[in-house]
Amino acid sequence: MALYPKAVLVPVTIVASCVCLSVVSTAQISRTDPVQVKPPLLRTIDPPSPDAAATDLEKRADELHGQKLYFDAIDYYRAALGKLSIPADQAKILNKICRTQLVMTRWHDGKKTCQQAIKANRKFPDPYNNLGVALYEEKKYGAAIKQYRKAIELDDSAASFYSNLGAALFSKKKFEESAKAYQRALELDPDVFERSSRQGVQAQVPRPEDRARYDYTVAKLYAKMGFSERSLEYLRKAMEEGYKDFKDAYKDEEFAELRKDKRFTELMAMKNPALPE
Protein backbone atom coordinates (compact mmCIF):
# COMPACT_ATOMS: atom_id res chain seq x y z
CA MET A 1 0.00 0.00 0.00
CA ALA A 2 1.41 3.27 -1.03
CA LEU A 3 2.07 5.78 1.68
CA TYR A 4 1.25 9.41 1.16
CA PRO A 5 2.19 12.24 3.41
CA LYS A 6 -0.69 13.46 5.43
CA ALA A 7 -2.12 16.70 4.23
CA VAL A 8 -1.58 19.46 6.74
CA LEU A 9 -4.28 22.06 6.90
CA VAL A 10 -2.92 25.54 7.53
CA PRO A 11 -5.35 28.19 8.70
CA VAL A 12 -5.97 30.90 6.15
CA THR A 13 -5.08 33.56 8.69
CA ILE A 14 -1.59 32.12 9.08
CA VAL A 15 -1.06 32.04 5.32
CA ALA A 16 -2.26 35.59 5.01
CA SER A 17 0.04 36.64 7.81
CA CYS A 18 3.00 35.02 6.09
CA VAL A 19 2.17 36.80 2.86
CA CYS A 20 1.90 40.12 4.68
CA LEU A 21 5.18 39.54 6.46
CA SER A 22 6.80 38.71 3.14
CA VAL A 23 5.50 41.92 1.62
CA VAL A 24 6.58 43.98 4.61
CA SER A 25 10.01 42.35 4.58
CA THR A 26 10.39 43.05 0.89
CA ALA A 27 9.33 46.64 1.36
CA GLN A 28 11.84 47.11 4.15
CA ILE A 29 14.62 45.70 2.01
CA SER A 30 13.72 47.89 -0.92
CA ARG A 31 14.14 50.98 1.24
CA THR A 32 17.74 50.04 1.97
CA ASP A 33 18.61 49.45 -1.67
CA PRO A 34 20.40 52.32 -3.41
CA VAL A 35 18.11 54.48 -5.50
CA GLN A 36 19.33 54.92 -9.02
CA VAL A 37 18.78 58.43 -10.31
CA LYS A 38 18.81 58.95 -14.02
CA PRO A 39 21.47 61.42 -15.16
CA PRO A 40 20.15 64.77 -16.33
CA LEU A 41 19.65 65.21 -20.02
CA LEU A 42 22.78 66.56 -21.60
CA ARG A 43 22.42 69.91 -23.25
CA THR A 44 23.40 69.47 -26.84
CA ILE A 45 25.14 72.29 -28.67
CA ASP A 46 25.30 72.32 -32.42
CA PRO A 47 28.87 71.87 -33.67
CA PRO A 48 30.59 74.86 -35.24
CA SER A 49 29.47 75.50 -38.79
CA PRO A 50 32.31 75.19 -41.32
CA ASP A 51 30.77 78.12 -43.19
CA ALA A 52 30.67 80.50 -40.20
CA ALA A 53 33.02 83.47 -40.06
CA ALA A 54 35.76 83.55 -37.45
CA THR A 55 34.17 86.53 -35.69
CA ASP A 56 30.82 84.73 -35.41
CA LEU A 57 32.49 81.60 -34.06
CA GLU A 58 34.41 83.64 -31.51
CA LYS A 59 31.25 85.46 -30.41
CA ARG A 60 29.42 82.16 -29.97
CA ALA A 61 32.37 80.75 -28.03
CA ASP A 62 32.26 83.75 -25.70
CA GLU A 63 28.57 83.10 -25.08
CA LEU A 64 29.21 79.43 -24.31
CA HIS A 65 32.03 80.36 -21.95
CA GLY A 66 29.66 82.74 -20.16
CA GLN A 67 27.17 79.88 -19.82
CA LYS A 68 29.93 77.69 -18.35
CA LEU A 69 29.74 75.29 -21.29
CA TYR A 70 33.49 75.21 -21.45
CA PHE A 71 34.10 72.21 -23.69
CA ASP A 72 31.73 73.61 -26.30
CA ALA A 73 33.35 77.02 -25.97
CA ILE A 74 36.76 75.52 -26.69
CA ASP A 75 35.36 73.75 -29.76
CA TYR A 76 34.12 77.07 -31.13
CA TYR A 77 37.33 78.89 -30.26
CA ARG A 78 39.36 76.26 -32.09
CA ALA A 79 37.04 76.49 -35.08
CA ALA A 80 37.58 80.25 -35.13
CA LEU A 81 41.32 79.76 -34.76
CA GLY A 82 41.38 77.54 -37.84
CA LYS A 83 40.07 80.40 -39.95
CA LEU A 84 42.71 82.92 -38.87
CA SER A 85 46.10 83.50 -40.46
CA ILE A 86 47.34 86.68 -38.74
CA PRO A 87 49.45 85.78 -35.67
CA ALA A 88 48.04 88.62 -33.53
CA ASP A 89 44.50 87.39 -34.18
CA GLN A 90 45.54 83.83 -33.42
CA ALA A 91 47.09 84.95 -30.13
CA LYS A 92 43.80 86.53 -29.06
CA ILE A 93 41.87 83.29 -29.61
CA LEU A 94 44.59 81.13 -28.05
CA ASN A 95 44.47 83.34 -24.97
CA LYS A 96 40.73 82.80 -24.70
CA ILE A 97 41.23 79.05 -24.96
CA CYS A 98 43.85 79.31 -22.23
CA ARG A 99 41.46 81.31 -20.05
CA THR A 100 38.75 78.68 -20.47
CA GLN A 101 41.16 75.86 -19.63
CA LEU A 102 42.22 77.68 -16.47
CA VAL A 103 38.60 78.07 -15.38
CA MET A 104 38.34 74.30 -15.84
CA THR A 105 41.47 73.93 -13.63
CA ARG A 106 43.32 72.24 -16.48
CA TRP A 107 46.57 73.94 -15.54
CA HIS A 108 48.88 71.91 -17.78
CA ASP A 109 46.74 72.43 -20.88
CA GLY A 110 46.34 76.09 -20.00
CA LYS A 111 50.09 76.60 -19.75
CA LYS A 112 50.69 75.04 -23.16
CA THR A 113 48.01 77.17 -24.80
CA CYS A 114 49.27 80.35 -23.12
CA GLN A 115 52.76 79.62 -24.39
CA GLN A 116 51.35 79.20 -27.91
CA ALA A 117 49.61 82.58 -27.57
CA ILE A 118 52.84 84.22 -26.42
CA LYS A 119 54.72 82.69 -29.33
CA ALA A 120 52.10 84.05 -31.74
CA ASN A 121 52.33 87.58 -30.30
CA ARG A 122 55.01 88.43 -27.76
CA LYS A 123 53.61 91.95 -27.32
CA PHE A 124 50.23 90.69 -26.06
CA PRO A 125 50.20 90.95 -22.23
CA ASP A 126 47.21 88.80 -21.33
CA PRO A 127 48.71 85.35 -21.98
CA TYR A 128 51.68 86.24 -19.78
CA ASN A 129 49.24 86.99 -16.98
CA ASN A 130 47.30 83.79 -17.59
CA LEU A 131 50.48 81.74 -17.72
CA GLY A 132 51.32 83.29 -14.36
CA VAL A 133 47.96 82.13 -12.99
CA ALA A 134 48.64 78.54 -14.09
CA LEU A 135 52.09 78.63 -12.47
CA TYR A 136 50.63 80.20 -9.34
CA GLU A 137 48.09 77.40 -9.01
CA GLU A 138 50.97 74.94 -9.25
CA LYS A 139 52.60 76.86 -6.36
CA LYS A 140 55.48 77.96 -8.59
CA TYR A 141 55.29 81.45 -7.16
CA GLY A 142 58.66 82.72 -8.38
CA ALA A 143 57.89 81.71 -11.96
CA ALA A 144 54.41 83.23 -11.67
CA ILE A 145 55.87 86.55 -10.46
CA LYS A 146 58.14 86.63 -13.51
CA GLN A 147 55.17 86.25 -15.86
CA TYR A 148 53.07 88.85 -14.05
CA ARG A 149 55.93 91.34 -14.29
CA LYS A 150 56.20 90.68 -18.04
CA ALA A 151 52.48 91.35 -18.41
CA ILE A 152 52.82 94.61 -16.46
CA GLU A 153 55.76 95.70 -18.61
CA LEU A 154 53.49 95.43 -21.63
CA ASP A 155 50.42 96.95 -19.97
CA ASP A 156 50.68 98.74 -16.64
CA SER A 157 47.01 99.76 -16.66
CA ALA A 158 45.50 96.35 -15.85
CA ALA A 159 44.53 96.15 -12.19
CA SER A 160 44.23 92.35 -12.30
CA PHE A 161 47.90 92.01 -13.27
CA TYR A 162 48.94 93.88 -10.12
CA SER A 163 46.43 91.96 -8.02
CA ASN A 164 47.81 88.64 -9.25
CA LEU A 165 51.37 89.87 -8.67
CA GLY A 166 50.38 90.83 -5.14
CA ALA A 167 48.97 87.35 -4.51
CA ALA A 168 52.15 85.64 -5.70
CA LEU A 169 54.37 87.96 -3.65
CA PHE A 170 52.11 87.37 -0.65
CA SER A 171 52.53 83.61 -1.03
CA LYS A 172 56.30 84.16 -1.07
CA LYS A 173 55.81 86.09 2.21
CA LYS A 174 57.12 89.27 0.60
CA PHE A 175 54.43 91.22 2.38
CA GLU A 176 55.68 94.77 1.78
CA GLU A 177 56.10 94.20 -1.95
CA SER A 178 52.75 92.47 -2.01
CA ALA A 179 51.04 95.42 -0.34
CA LYS A 180 52.51 97.80 -2.93
CA ALA A 181 51.21 95.65 -5.78
CA TYR A 182 47.78 95.41 -4.16
CA GLN A 183 47.71 99.16 -3.58
CA ARG A 184 48.45 99.82 -7.24
CA ALA A 185 45.71 97.37 -8.21
CA LEU A 186 43.21 99.23 -6.04
CA GLU A 187 44.29 102.58 -7.43
CA LEU A 188 43.54 101.31 -10.92
CA ASP A 189 40.30 99.58 -9.98
CA PRO A 190 38.74 99.70 -6.48
CA ASP A 191 36.60 96.69 -7.45
CA VAL A 192 39.54 94.54 -8.48
CA PHE A 193 39.13 92.08 -5.61
CA GLU A 194 35.48 91.56 -6.49
CA ARG A 195 35.97 90.49 -10.09
CA SER A 196 38.10 88.27 -12.29
CA SER A 197 40.58 89.68 -14.73
CA ARG A 198 39.34 90.71 -18.14
CA GLN A 199 40.72 87.72 -20.05
CA GLY A 200 41.91 85.44 -17.29
CA VAL A 201 41.40 83.99 -13.86
CA GLN A 202 42.33 86.14 -10.94
CA ALA A 203 44.62 84.38 -8.50
CA GLN A 204 43.69 83.95 -4.85
CA VAL A 205 45.66 83.33 -1.69
CA PRO A 206 45.57 79.52 -1.47
CA ARG A 207 46.60 78.64 2.06
CA PRO A 208 43.95 79.09 4.80
CA GLU A 209 46.61 80.23 7.26
CA ASP A 210 47.40 83.16 4.94
CA ARG A 211 43.81 84.18 4.39
CA ALA A 212 43.40 86.15 7.62
CA ARG A 213 46.52 88.19 7.01
CA TYR A 214 45.47 88.77 3.41
CA ASP A 215 42.08 90.13 4.51
CA TYR A 216 43.73 92.38 7.08
CA THR A 217 46.16 93.70 4.45
CA VAL A 218 43.32 94.49 2.05
CA ALA A 219 41.39 96.19 4.88
CA LYS A 220 44.40 98.45 5.50
CA LEU A 221 44.66 99.35 1.83
CA TYR A 222 40.98 100.20 1.54
CA ALA A 223 41.18 102.27 4.72
CA LYS A 224 44.19 104.16 3.41
CA MET A 225 42.27 105.01 0.25
CA GLY A 226 39.19 106.13 2.18
CA PHE A 227 36.91 103.20 1.30
CA SER A 228 35.46 102.73 4.78
CA GLU A 229 32.74 100.24 3.87
CA ARG A 230 35.11 97.84 2.17
CA SER A 231 37.77 98.29 4.79
CA LEU A 232 35.31 97.30 7.50
CA GLU A 233 34.17 94.35 5.39
CA TYR A 234 37.69 92.95 5.09
CA LEU A 235 38.49 93.83 8.68
CA ARG A 236 35.52 91.75 9.75
CA LYS A 237 36.73 88.89 7.56
CA ALA A 238 40.17 89.08 9.17
CA MET A 239 38.57 88.93 12.60
CA GLU A 240 36.41 85.95 11.65
CA GLU A 241 39.47 84.19 10.21
CA GLY A 242 41.21 84.69 13.56
CA TYR A 243 44.00 87.03 12.49
CA LYS A 244 46.45 86.90 15.38
CA ASP A 245 47.50 90.56 15.24
CA PHE A 246 43.98 91.90 14.78
CA LYS A 247 44.34 94.38 17.65
CA ASP A 248 46.98 96.21 15.62
CA ALA A 249 44.00 97.94 14.02
CA TYR A 250 44.01 100.19 17.11
CA LYS A 251 47.45 101.55 16.21
CA ASP A 252 48.07 101.04 12.46
CA GLU A 253 48.13 104.46 10.85
CA GLU A 254 46.09 103.27 7.86
CA PHE A 255 43.08 102.94 10.18
CA ALA A 256 43.49 106.41 11.73
CA GLU A 257 40.40 107.85 10.03
CA LEU A 258 38.42 104.63 10.26
CA ARG A 259 38.89 104.55 14.03
CA LYS A 260 36.68 107.65 14.20
CA ASP A 261 33.82 105.65 12.70
CA LYS A 262 31.45 104.16 15.29
CA ARG A 263 31.18 101.03 13.16
CA PHE A 264 34.87 100.41 13.75
CA THR A 265 34.29 100.68 17.50
CA GLU A 266 31.34 98.30 17.29
CA LEU A 267 33.34 95.81 15.25
CA MET A 268 36.28 95.86 17.61
CA ALA A 269 33.93 95.39 20.57
CA MET A 270 32.48 92.22 19.14
CA LYS A 271 33.34 89.08 21.03
CA ASN A 272 34.66 86.46 18.67
CA PRO A 273 36.05 83.12 19.92
CA ALA A 274 38.49 83.06 17.00
CA LEU A 275 40.02 86.37 18.04
CA PRO A 276 43.16 85.85 20.15
CA GLU A 277 43.29 87.63 23.48
Language-model segments: what does each one mean?
Residues 51, 85-88, 122, 156, ...:
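Short coil turns that delineate tetratricopeptide repeat
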Residues 55, 89-92, 126, 160, ...:
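Start-of-helix register in tetratricopeptide repeats
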Residues 82-85, 115-119, 150-153, 186-187, ...:
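Conserved structural position within tetratricopeptide repeats
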Residues 69-75, 92, 103-116, 137-150, ...:
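Structural signature of tandem alpha-helical TPR/SEL1-like repeats
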Residues 93-96, 130, 164, 198, ...:
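Canonical tetratricopeptide repeat
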Residues 52-83, 92, 99-103:
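Alpha-helical segment of the N-proximal tetratricopeptide repeat
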